[in-house]
């Protein structure tokens, strides 16, 4: 099939793009990488009156390190650029790893961060990573600019807090902790995940081996994707870890507690029961990888600061 007729407009500025959306309320769509929109146009699942091309807007580009250790990432940043950016790998390695899991090379070269977030596919990697990182989504519209916590941005299947006349402009990512894990299961490389988990572990107290106590001085954020209608905080698993160590035993118990928070779909690729089982296994794996990274990095820093003559 081919798209239904539409008018094409290439915006020359953010203000012009907003005006074009406002001129066709509810009947305009933004074109960035087109990796989700174009197939939907071809299948006539969407029939916009106007297609507003925003690819020329410099206001939506760039990966900028922030003084606090975080990042500001423009909405037009391609997945491949996220994966290859030294700044992202250093300051938000979970996000870089998630970007490497997106589709195939052609999709990563064309698809954009903003497009993935605005489309809000519940099996997509980048939304889950940004919820785990406690990022903030910046949007601009006729009423001005506002910020939305990533956890509140995704409201359901292909549904976000973005108004029809607003444009997602950038994402603010806070400085990431040393402990993180990102795991997913797909039928083939490049396929949408049957299930996946993103984990971030922050510990505010001195390093304690062989395990780390979280309690009130640290935080663990676990987010499942492909297991509900949006990126889901696995709060049951998080509660298991409150005030205790992260080790093989607690990771396994946290994994078991993740299942009840999930409401996965069932289809020809995997039953709901199977996807829920995947969530329990992947939660355990993501936690153990997070702790391995955290302890490894903190051990390196600790050893260098105390004993290395070259530090």
Predicted ranges, named:
Residues 1-214, 218-294:
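C-terminal structural segment of proteins
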Residues 296-311:
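Positively charged, low-complexity/disordered segments
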């Amino acid at each position: 099939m081919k798209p239904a007729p539409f008018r094409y407009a290439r915006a020359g500025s953010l203000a012009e793009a907003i005006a074009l959306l406002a001129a066709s309320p509810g009947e305009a769509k933004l074109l960035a990488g087109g990796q989700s929109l174009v197939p939907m146009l071809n299948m006539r699942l969407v029939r916009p009156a106007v297609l507003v091309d925003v690819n020329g807007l410099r206001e939506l580009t760039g990966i900028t390190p922030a003084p606090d250790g975080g990042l500001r990432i423009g909405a037009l940043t391609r997945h491949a650029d996220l994966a290859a950016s030294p700044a992202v790998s250093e300051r938000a390695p979970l996000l870089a790893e998630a970007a490497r899991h997106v589709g195939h090379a052609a999709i990563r070269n064309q698809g954009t961060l903003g497009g993935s977030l605005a489309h809000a596919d519940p099996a997509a990697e980048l939304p889950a990573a940004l919820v785990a990182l406690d990022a903030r989504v910046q949007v601009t519209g006729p009423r001005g600019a506002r910020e939305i916590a990533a956890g509140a941005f995704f409201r359901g299947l292909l549904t976000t807090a973005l108004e029809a006349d607003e444009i997602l402009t950038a994402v603010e990512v806070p400085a990431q902790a040393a402990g993180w894990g990102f795991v997913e299961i797909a039928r083939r490389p490049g396929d949408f995940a049957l299930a996946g988990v993103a984990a971030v572990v922050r510990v505010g107290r001195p390093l304690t081996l062989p395990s780390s106590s979280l309690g009130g001085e640290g935080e663990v954020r676990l987010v499942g994707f492909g297991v509900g209608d949006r990126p889901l905080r696995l709060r049951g698993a998080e509660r298991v870890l409150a005030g205790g160590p992260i080790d093989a035993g607690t990771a396994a118990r946290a994994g078991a507690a993740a299942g009840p928070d999930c409401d996965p779909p069932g289809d020809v690729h995997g039953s709901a029961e199977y996807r829920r089982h995947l969530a329990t296994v992947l939660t355990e794996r993501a936690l153990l990888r997070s702790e391995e990274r955290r302890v490894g990095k903190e051990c390196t820093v600790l050893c260098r600061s105390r004993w290395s003559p070259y530090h």
